[in-house]
């Protein structure tokens, strides 16, 4: 809430800024040099995990509209859950806004 002198000006109702989600798989990066042998995770009978991919996610900071970019490795079902949360009431803050409003 903003405190100040009374005015006769009526502001339009607050609307959330439009949110654009760019969720797409990221191509795997080929590494050069020595690599540690990959271990297979223990098998889980009766539980089929979804195939995990790396997704690049860009969301605006809720404080200053700066674009925040990060990658996540998850299944398509989980990235859709993240998308649903972002379209509802989950907001991200950049480190500057977190310090100022934390």
Swiss-Prot record:
Localization of this protein: Host cytoplasm; Host nucleus
InterPro entries referenced in this protein's UniProt entry, alphabetically: Papilloma_E7
The keyword Repressor is annotated on this UniProt entry: no
Region of interest: E7 terminal domain: 2-36
Keywords of this entry: Activator, DNA-binding, Early protein, G1/S host cell cycle checkpoint dysregulation by virus, Host cytoplasm, Host nucleus, Host-virus interaction, Inhibition of host innate immune response by virus, Inhibition of host interferon signaling pathway by virus, Interferon antiviral system evasion, Metal-binding, Modulation of host cell cycle by virus, Oncogene, Transcription, Transcription regulation, Viral immunoevasion, Zinc, Zinc-finger
Organism of this sequence: European elk papillomavirus
This protein's domain notes: The E7 terminal domain is an intrinsically disordered domain, whose flexibility and conformational transitions confer target adaptability to the oncoprotein. It allows adaptation to a variety of protein targets and exposes the PEST degradation sequence that regulates its turnover in the cell.
Family to which the UniProt record says this protein belongs: Belongs to the papillomaviridae E7 protein family.
Protein name, entry field: Protein E7
GO biological process: one example: symbiont-mediated suppression of host type I interferon-mediated signaling pathway
Region of interest called Disordered, as start-end residue ranges on this chain: 30-52
Gene designation: E7
Its biological purpose: Plays a role in viral genome replication by driving entry of quiescent cells into the cell cycle. Stimulation of progression from G1 to S phase allows the virus to efficiently use the cellular DNA replicating machinery to achieve viral genome replication. E7 protein has both transforming and trans-activating activities. Induces the disassembly of the E2F1 transcription factor from RB1, with subsequent transcriptional activation of E2F1-regulated S-phase genes. Interferes with host histone deacetylation mediated by HDAC1 and HDAC2, leading to transcription activation.
GO MF term list: DNA binding; DNA-binding transcription factor activity; protein domain specific binding; zinc ion binding
GO terms under cellular component: host cell cytoplasm; host cell nucleus
SUPFAM superfamilies membership: E7 C-terminal domain-like
């Amino acid at each position: 809430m903003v405190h100040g002198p009374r005015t006769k000006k009526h502001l339009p109702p607050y609307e959330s800024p439009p949110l654009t989600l760019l969720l797409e798989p990221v191509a795997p990066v080929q590494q050069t040099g020595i690599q540690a042998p990959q271990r297979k995770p223990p098998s889980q009978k009766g539980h089929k995990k979804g195939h995990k991919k790396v997704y690049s996610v860009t969301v605006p900071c809720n404080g200053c509209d700066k674009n925040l970019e990060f990658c996540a490795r998850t299944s398509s079902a989980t990235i859709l859950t993240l998308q649903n949360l972002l379209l509802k009431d989950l907001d991200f803050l950049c480190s500057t806004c977190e310090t100022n409003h934390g």
